[in-house]
Design a protein with these regions (language model features):
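A sequence-level detector of short, solvent-exposed, charge-rich linear segments
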Residues: 94, 156, 185-188
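A conserved mid-domain beta-alpha-beta active-site/ligand-binding segment of alpha/beta enzyme cores
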Residues: 179-191
């Protein structure tokens, strides 16, 4: 039964924490523990023209032109099945983020992480509304070097520096799918 600890799973995208940690989340909730999955990058730029790599990614994943609502629905259903709470933050994932001049920051999802301290601080401020001294925060290891996973990993390290208990989880599919290594190599070559 619950010891008043809240277990918070940081998910870079819709489905990342669920895909990586569903067994453990299910175990926690079945024991009466409080679990909250916070998806960081679940916003979508409805009025923005997509860059070619975003269009290609949508096509590859069969996402359609405006995929976010369907993905949020799937995530809500998964969280309901696992009997955990969820929050969908409205920040954009890397392929949709732009700099101050309106230029896309990242050409592909395996880009090198840029300095986005303002965004990072905004996200941390929003996360702090859900944290207390009894929280355990789960954060991706960023094994596949997806820039958004690396970004969320850096948020985990910042929370750790702030004295929150942070545990890092292996992000699927990167940890188990050898074909992903081949795919990542090809993606890095996209221009």
């Amino acid at each position: 039964m619950s010891n008043n600890t809240k277990y918070i799973f940081l998910s870079p995208h819709l489905d990342d924490a669920i895909f990586s940690c569903s067994d453990y989340i299910s175990k926690l909730t079945s024991e009466g523990e409080i679990v909250l999955v916070i998806t960081i990058f679940s916003g979508y730029p409805l009025s923005q023209q997509l860059q070619p790599s975003a269009k290609q990614f949508h096509k590859l994943c069969n996402l359609g032109k405006y995929p976010i609502e369907e993905r949020k629905k799937e995530d809500r259903l998964a969280c309901e099945r696992l009997q955990c709470d969820f929050r969908h933050l409205s920040y954009y994932e890397c392929l949709y983020r732009k700099d101050r001049n309106g230029n896309f920051l990242y050409r592909h999802i395996y880009s090198e992480l840029k300095n986005e301290d303002t965004l990072k601080n905004d996200i941390i401020k929003e996360l702090l509304m859900h944290l207390d001294d009894k929280c355990v925060v789960y954060c991706p290891l960023s094994l596949g070097d997806h820039v958004d996973h690396v970004f969320v990993n850096s948020i985990g390290r910042a929370l750790e520096f702030m004295r929150y208990k942070v545990i890092y989880y292996e992000d699927f599919p990167y940890v188990s799918d050898s074909s992903m290594v081949s795919y990542m190599g090809k993606t890095k070559e996209l221009k």
